[in-house]
């Protein structure tokens, strides 16, 4: 046998080994890219949680009535304002991510400008809602004095709406390009000032000052991020010269609005479900104890949510970038790599929650043994929920990265509202399971959400989605034009 024939006989094995090596290298490369995007986001989200905790602490120092009214006002702001603005700004992720992958900086610029205008417009009716919060709360049976404090708190929180109308799009604009370090550093700088701002304003204006500190801190982030975008974009002349800031067509607006509806509902349906759970818990026997346990457990969940949300942003960015670059294999690899990471992270998060269940409750109370025991028990159930919660977040962001947020909306609607809440209420009230029943219902509902999204993702035609991304970013049209002109010249 000749040397040539020997080498040929080894070709299949060598080829298989090379393919395996190449696959591992590509996965490792993908993980490195996602770590670079995700780690700063984890820090940023944890800082945001710290900012909210600081606000709660300073509200508590204003007295029991101010704490109740301010907390109620902030919950109202979350449900009617923040969730809506965050949800609508999420529509930028697939457009900007795919535009960046396709190097269509004009589309990036115009989407940022349109998103800011859209959020400012949406902020107007939300503002009127906040100004009438006193009537709304008393109409639902809330105490007059608490409703009045909530109205005062929201009145001085109003500037947060236009500020978030700039902040949310700026964050989405940068993160969709994989630029997350500036977001982390600007958030860290502003958060470091949040405590001194609170000290000064809470002493001078009381609960009004605590509300003002929230939007002043976010306003600092807006100024810093705006400065960063302007300076860096001007340094990269190619990006700045493409312009597009004021060059919007009706089709551009239609695309953004079509995506913003499902994106907004996806976020709101999830946020509102947790708020409804808290309200329903207030109808259990010993409501003060039950609500306290649930809030303490959810506070630990918020810490894990910082990691969860960062994973989701990573995969949405990577999938949309690869589809925009017309690389369906890269998008597929990014999606499934992050899904595996999400499953592993969910298991780790569950173990961390179990490990801290004895310590976490003691941070809030030392004397109430019923609450301490309740926290230990409920954190075990919540740990099981985290196992499915992490991959659920990843799956939701995968479908968003493919510009199909309606899939996430249908999954959340089915899982949270057709199953989790009805089943939880049945177990809690009729089966006398109490708070445990609500969490079991939540687990079953989230599991359904995950199952639906996994089926959707398994059926994705990545080649087709890459083609759609080229149409979205107008590359297909440009290529057809250039091909047509080329054929004319040949003829």
Curated annotation (Swiss-Prot):
One matching Pfam family: MatE
Principal place of residence: membrane
CDD domains hit by this protein: MATE_eukaryotic
InterPro entries: MATE_euk, MATE_fam
Mutant phenotype after disruption: Defective in stomatal responses to Co(2). Showed more rapid leaf expansion under high CO(2) condition as compared with the wild type.
Annotated membrane topology: Multi-pass membrane protein
Localisation per UniProt entry: Cell membrane
GO function terms (MF aspect): antiporter activity; xenobiotic transmembrane transporter activity
Record GO biological process: cellular response to carbon dioxide; regulation of stomatal opening; xenobiotic detoxification by transmembrane export across the plasma membrane
Membrane recorded as keyword: yes
Keyword Nucleotide-binding part of the UniProt annotation: no
Keywords attached to this entry: Cell membrane, Membrane, Transmembrane, Transmembrane helix, Transport
Gene Ontology CC: one annotated term: plasma membrane
Coiled-coil segments on the chain, per record: none
Transmembrane segments: 39-59, 72-92, 111-131, 154-174, 181-201, 212-232, 261-281, 291-311, 336-356, 379-399, 409-429, 438-458
Tissues of expression: Preferentially expressed in guard cells.
Family affiliation: Belongs to the multi antimicrobial extrusion (MATE) (TC 2.A.66.1) family.
Biological function: Could function as a HCO(3)(-) -sensing component in the CO(2) signaling pathway in guard cells. Acts as an upstream repressor of HT1. Plays a role in stomatal response to CO(2).
Assembly with partners or alone: Interacts with BCA4 and HT1.
Name recorded for this polypeptide: Protein DETOXIFICATION 56
Species this chain originates from: Arabidopsis thaliana
Organismal lineage: Eukaryota, Viridiplantae, Streptophyta, Embryophyta, Tracheophyta
């Amino acid at each position: 046998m000749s040397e040539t024939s020997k080498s040929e006989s080894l070709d299949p094995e060598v080829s298989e080994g090379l393919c395996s090596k190449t696959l591992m290298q590509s996965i490792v490369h993908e993980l490195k890219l996602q770590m670079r995007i995700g780690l700063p986001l984890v820090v940023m989200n944890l800082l945001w949680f710290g900012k909210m905790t600081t606000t709660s602490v300073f509200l508590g120092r204003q007295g029991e009535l101010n704490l109740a009214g301010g907390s109620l006002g902030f919950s109202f702001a979350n449900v009617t304002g923040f969730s809506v603005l965050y949800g609508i700004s999420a529509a930028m992720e697939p457009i900007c991510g795919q535009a960046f992958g396709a190097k269509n900086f004009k589309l990036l610029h115009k989407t940022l400008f349109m998103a800011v205008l859209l959020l400012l417009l949406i902020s107007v009716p939300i503002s009127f809602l906040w100004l009438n919060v006193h009537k709304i709360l008393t109409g639902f049976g809330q105490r007059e004095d608490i409703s009045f404090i909530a109205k005062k708190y929201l009145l001085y929180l109003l500037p947060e709406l236009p500020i978030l109308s700039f902040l949310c799009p700026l964050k989405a604009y940068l993160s969709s390009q994989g630029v997350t370090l500036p977001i982390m550093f600007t958030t860290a700088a502003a958060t470091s000032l949040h405590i001194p701002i609170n000290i000064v304003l809470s002493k001078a204006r009381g609960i009004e000052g605590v509300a003002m500190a929230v939007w002043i801190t976010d306003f600092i982030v807006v100024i810093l991020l705006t400065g960063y975008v302007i300076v860096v974009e001007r340094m990269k002349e190619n990006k700045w010269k493409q312009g597009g800031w004021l060059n919007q067509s009706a089709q551009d607006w239609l695309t953004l609005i079509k995506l913003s509806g499902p994106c907004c509902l996806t976020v709101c349906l999830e946020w509102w479900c947790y708020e409804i759970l808290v309200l329903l818990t207030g109808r259990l026997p010993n409501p003060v104890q039950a609500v306290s346990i649930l809030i303490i457990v959810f506070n630990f969940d918020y810490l894990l949510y910082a990691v969860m949300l960062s994973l989701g942003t990573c995969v949405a960015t990577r999938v949309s970038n690869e589809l925009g670059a017309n690389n369906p294999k890269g998008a597929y690899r990014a999606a499934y790599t992050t899904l595996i990471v999400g499953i592993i992270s969910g298991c780790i998060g569950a173990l961390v929650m179990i490990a801290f269940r004895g310590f976490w409750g003691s941070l809030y109370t030392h004397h109430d043994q019923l609450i301490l025991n309740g926290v230990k028990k409920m954190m075990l159930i919540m740990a099981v929920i985290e196992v499915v919660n992490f991959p659920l977040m990843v799956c939701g962001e995968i479908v968003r990265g493919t510009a199909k947020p309606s899939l996430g909306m249908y999954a959340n609607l089915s899982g949270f509202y057709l199953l989790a809440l009805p089943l939880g209420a049945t177990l809690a009230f009729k089966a006398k399971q109490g708070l445990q029943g609500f969490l079991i219902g939540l687990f079953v509902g989230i599991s359904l959400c995950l199952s639906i999204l996994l089926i959707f993702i398994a059926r994705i035609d990545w080649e087709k989605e890459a083609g759609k991304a080229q149409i979205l970013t107008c590359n297909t049209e440009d290529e057809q034009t250039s091909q047509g002109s080329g054929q004319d010249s040949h003829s």
